[in-house]
Amino acid sequence: GQEIPQTERVQSNIPAAEVTKATQSPLFLTMLFCMGLTATLELAPGRWIESLMGPAFVEAGFKNNAALLVLVYGMALMAVLRYSAGSFVKKFSPTGLLMGSAILGGVGLFAMTYASSMQSIFLTATIFYVGVCFFWPTMIGFVAERIPNSGALGLCLMGGIGMLVVGYVTVPGVGMIQDYYKE
């Protein structure tokens, strides 16, 4: 049979107890909490795009659901920027990139609430999506670099908590808010 290669943790002689201890550190627990916020900030506004920006699109002569173009544009922009994220991390450091992302994401989200023309919608969406696009991968990288003993378990927990918060808290929560304000 084929021999399965050793994991990086085993090759580095890091005991499993050390991995568990690293995932219980205050910095790691703070990053888990922040990952929940990150996932919410990145994915929740997409649920509101149609209701917030739909009227401006209809006024500009587009059919219903055309506001979803903003969502498609944002996802495409994030894919392109995430592909080149390494150069941004080298230029600004992970902590600097997270801070810049938080500022741009917050400013963009706030500005989107005031956007009323096609130009302002896409400008504010660009600011927002440039801000949030680096959050998820940079947080995973931050844990890998700053809490290396957390290993694969730490990376798995970071991604997992993000998806759990989105699936079990954000989507139902945003849905309840939307249902409340529709009536």
Per-segment meaning from a language model:
Residues 1-9:
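C-terminal membrane-cytosol helix-exit motif in multi-pass small-molecule transporters
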Residues 20-72, 76-79, 167-180:
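Extracytoplasmic gate region of multi-pass secondary transporters
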Residues 43, 129-137, 163, 167:
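Small-residue-rich segments within alpha-helical transmembrane domains of MFS-like 12-TM solute carriers
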Residues 81-94:
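Helix-to-loop junctions at the C-terminal end of transmembrane segments
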Residues 96-111:
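Structural signature of the two symmetry-related core transmembrane helices
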Residues 113-124:
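Helix-loop junctions at membrane interfaces in 12-TM secondary transporters
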Residues 134-148:
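Intracellular juxtamembrane helix-capping segments at the cytosolic ends
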Residues 150-182:
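A late C-terminal transmembrane helix in Major Facilitator Superfamily
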